[in-house]
Amino acid sequence: MQALAEQTETKNVYDVLDFNLWYGNNQALKNISLQLKEKHVTAIIGPSGCGKSTFIKTLNLMSRLNPDIRMAGELNFRGENLLTTSMDLAELRKAVGMVFQKPNPFPKSIYENVAYGPRIHGIRKKKELDEIVESSLKGAFLWEEVKDRLNKNALSLSGGQQQRLCIARALATKPEVLLMDEPTSALDPISTTKVEELITSLRDSYTIVIVTHNMQQAARISDETAFFYMGELVEIGPTQRIFSNPEHKRTEDYVSGQFG
């Protein structure tokens, strides 16, 4: 039983091998190889322009929205190379949700924001939608704050509430993976704390990949940390080791604040 538990714990959702990405003639990611573990929080850190956000957007192929992008290598999700698979993009993005730096709720009601995804994927019965909306808002620590005003415009919420609504919207499609691109950088400290608590509560149910500039945040909430520099992966490992005993001097210099 113990061996089975260890095997389950270390299952990889993503296996990236020699992955390269170009914007036109400019190479933005160079020979990236890493594994992202199931039901772990992985923080992606590094200075501005190092490729963090570019990398995370490849994980659900949002990068394909840019016609100038070219990719090579292996980007394996559930054992399928996303660069060669015929997997439907809508199904991929249902399985791999995305939360952006700036809260981006739809200009619709709170209810409709959360129900939108399930409707797109064929759920029509009001009772079922009601249950999904409630469970998703509870999962995002927002239900108690909005349960009596679900028909209010989502844009009437505070910035922190809007970001948690966007997380609820991502949860509503029952994803396997949540990608978060600096989800707290536009929030005040109190809202940031709530989102960090939310991420901690979700880690047992979802694989989470978060881009952050905040070293303290990465140390607080992640199980593993990957350090990117100038389009390359310098190292990845358990967060405690990355911050206390990194293998590379460049990592040590970055996490100790000597450059950023």
UniProtKB/Swiss-Prot annotation:
InterPro entries: AAA+_ATPase, ABC_transporter-like_ATP-bd, ABC_transporter-like_CS, P-loop_NTPase, PstB-like. Pfam families: ABC_tran. Its EC number is 7.3.2.1. Keywords: ATP-binding, Cell membrane, Membrane, Nucleotide-binding, Phosphate transport, Translocase, Transport. PROSITE patterns: ABC_TRANSPORTER_1, ABC_TRANSPORTER_2, PSTB. ATP binds at G46, P47, S48, G49, C50, G51, K52, S53. GO terms for cellular component: plasma membrane. The keyword Acyltransferase does not apply. GO terms for molecular function: ATP binding; ATP hydrolysis activity; ATPase-coupled phosphate ion transmembrane transporter activity. SUPFAM superfamilies: P-loop containing nucleoside triphosphate hydrolases. It is an enzyme of class 7 (translocase). It is found in: Cell membrane. Residues 8-255 form the ABC transporter domain. The keyword Ligase does not apply. One of its GO terms (biological process) is phosphate ion transmembrane transport. SMART domains: AAA. It is a peripheral membrane protein. It catalyses: phosphate(out) + ATP + H2O = ADP + 2 phosphate(in) + H(+). PANTHER family: ABC TRANSPORTER I FAMILY MEMBER 17. Part of the ABC transporter complex PstSACB involved in phosphate import. Responsible for energy coupling to the transport system. The complex is composed of two ATP-binding proteins (PstB), two transmembrane proteins (PstC and PstA) and a solute-binding protein (PstS). Belongs to the ABC transporter superfamily. Phosphate importer (TC 3.A.1.7) family. This is Phosphate import ATP-binding protein PstB 1. It comes from Shouchella clausii (strain KSM-K16) (Alkalihalobacillus clausii). The lineage of its organism: Bacteria, Bacillati, Bacillota, Bacilli, Bacillales. The gene is pstB1.
